[in-house]
Amino acid sequence: MKRKIFFIIINISIVCFLSVILEICAHLVPAKKDLLGDIVNVLEEDSLLFWRQKANLRTMFQDFPVETNSLGLRVNRSAYQQMTGHTFKIVCLGASPTFGWAVKYEDTYSCQLEKMLNDKYGREKTYEVINAGIIGYSSYQGLLFLKRDILKLKPDLITVAYGLNDVDRHRFFRSNGKSDKELKPKNLLLVSLENLLNRSLFFRLCKNFIFKVESARTDFSGNWGDIYFGKLRVSAQDFRRNINEIIRIANQNRIKVILVKIPINSASFEKKILIQQAQHDIALSKGLDYLKEKRINDAIIQFKDALAYDSSSSKAFFYLAVCYEMKKEPVIAQHYFQEAKKMQAVQLRAGLEVYNGIIEEIARVKGIPLADAGPDFIRNRERKIFATPIHPNNEGHKIVAAVIYDAMLRYNL
């Protein structure tokens, strides 16, 4: 019996030793630039919310330092000050534009708003503004997040800025073509195990190597055949319902609400030569016909022709990736999958305008304060105010902070 236990201990020790060695070796492998990989490294799965930002994180993301607290909310721990006396607490709900994509924490609109308020009213009361922006969140996730986590913070006021991801068809986890509300909570034990394994760089490298193209395709859409015909993450009707429910819950808990509209860079989405759209559609249609017939090389020619007419065609990039996957060229396929995801942002514009219209309507009907950054963004369009086509830079965040500040003054909040 003792001999058996001894061998078990020896085997476990060997496995642990080899695991440590392999993990060290994995960290010596040169890292490739991978946007989706960078995003997922900041996130982890969540049973109810699909994902959350990792707690107590300290890393670089999009070339800027990112730190999170125990709730996974973005903070600057080195500059944190304990609030004393009467503190008016504001929580900024939203997605990556609220989180501060490609900007320093000090430049996020939540941080700038806190400074503006304390500079003006600091002698009377203290303002604490919490950045509760979570990368990739829709209004559906925001509603669940409010109920499960944010109410515990006991905010006096929340700002609500959703819509950007509601009109998308992609999720960073569990992207399977279904809408957000159709996903059931995932087994908590399974989620915990997956998160534990994903902490290992060696495990992630092995997973990426084994499922290289498949994981890229799954991360992008879940099912490539249905991606452009699948459901939006949140329909317009459900978006309206989610925002109204957020307002109802806030009112029930005596929390004031400001709805926020953050525009995207419309100028970057304008077609340079509109007349070429027809040629793009023809080439894309021919390519799809060839793809169905397994005439892969002919399909590639047509999809590249489509890109010549519209260089932002997410569909052309996507189906090029499918072609190269079928040709057993995973590196090229993954490149085109990545490009397809980037260009899919182009398709957000029309949908986001509809959802922003819903926000305006709700604010008008319910008498909810609206902080609309759109007009100020248009007035400042000659300046550089975007870090990416869908994310404001530090100057853009300054504008958003100012319109929220003005809304607070107008409504005496």
What is the role of each PLM region?
Residues 9-24:
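Hydrophobic membrane-insertion alpha-helices, especially the h-region
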Residues 24-36, 268-269:
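Helix-to-loop transition at the C-terminal end of transmembrane segments
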Residues 31-124, 380:
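Membrane/wall-proximal cationic-aromatic binding patches
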Residues 89-93, 130, 158-160:
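Conserved beta-strand elements of the Class I
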Residues 107, 123, 163-361, 365, ...:
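Serine-dependent acyl-ester chemistry module
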Residues 122-151:
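A conserved hydrophobic secondary-structure block that centers on an alpha-helix together
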Residues 139, 143, 236, 240, ...:
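Short, amphipathic alpha-helical "lid/cap" segments that border enzyme active or binding sites
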Residues 150-159, 164:
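Proline-aspartate-enriched helix->loop->beta-strand connector
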